[in-house]
Amino acid sequence: MDDNDDWFTICDEKNIMLEKNNNNEYKISFNINLKGGEDTVINVLKNGQLFELLSALNPDVIDKITVTEHDGVHSVFMTLKNSDQADGEEVDKIINVYFSLKYNFKENKCIITSKKNENENNDEYHSDIKKKYGKDFLHVSKIKIKVVEKNNKTSVCITFKTDIQKSNNIKNMFIGLYFKKIFYRFKQYFE
């Protein structure tokens, strides 16, 4: 993603910023003031507990996360839901997303980037996913999660692109807002 893209703010509440550009790329950025101890963002990432923690912190938003690892690449299948029941529906706005990630650690820094599967644009690949999980998954690409810890402060910047046709801007926005909500609770967990 190009830092020179024109980003506009969707939401900047609770010290966590959600921005979007015209290419359906989203950026979530926030700082965490660590309360001390061994439970740091970097340690959670190193121990492979990120998605387990996100799921535990967001039972009303994340219905299910399945993570498989092969050759250092983590394939993540996530079902997002809205079950606040404010509109009288028991569960609605279910969105299934998937992405593949590669982790890179250096001292007090972790950079997670999306790793494209050669078969992702292949109809047979999508058919195999649907057969395996019983549902269609929307691909989220160009993911970059940069985490830097310094002096009891952690800076997190997450960028990603939704691979949904422009005509479905509402679904794009839901994914951006769901991810913001998920990572807001992640931020709260460490503070």
Spans of model-derived segments:
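Eukaryotic helix-grip
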Residues: 2-191
